[in-house]
Amino acid sequence: MEELAKKERRAMDPGGLKKEGKVEEEAGKEEGREEEGGEEEEVTSETLRGKPRPLPISALPAFSYIPPRHQGPKERSYFSREGQTGIVSLYDCVFKRRLDYNQKLHRDDREHAKNLGLHINEEEQERTVPVLMSSVYGKRINQPIEPLNRDYGHVSHVKTDFYRKNEIPSIKGPGFGHINPA
């Protein structure tokens, strides 16, 4: 019982019984007891708080874990580009907001309410496989899928030349030439 009372007093007065005046005597007695009975752990806020326990296996997400900061190469990131923003603290997000008026923004408080400040088209052009389905159309406008083939270009010239020289009236408009439509 006496040891329990001393532990409680020591927890309440971490300075070690300075109020009673018998600091040196009590400290010597306690050290002797600690050596005999084993080491006693000093009670601090860190030991009371303890180490944070890891989550149980059932609480861990299987495939949905997203790391807070992506540090890998840009080819392996979702957006295929380097992160441009640094670490912004919660205090700055809440208390250091821009208070100036932007007339192009919607009345909503969201920062990217109408995608102002975002560069979606540039991100889509940098990706090897586009995320947005609408970006597939015209994705490779600078790089045509099939190279231009001029091998059969002379066919159209031959056809026009043939019909012009032989004056075939079916090519010409109605009522023109010696054959009139019935």
Curated annotation (Swiss-Prot):
Expressed in sperm (at protein level). Residues 1-54 are annotated as: Disordered. Keywords: Cell projection, Cilium, Cytoplasm, Cytoskeleton, Flagellum. It comes from the Eukaryota. GO terms for cellular component: axonemal B tubule inner sheath; axoneme; ciliary basal body; sperm flagellum. On the 2D-gel the determined pI of this protein is: 7.7, its MW is: 22 kDa. This is Cilia- and flagella-associated protein 90.
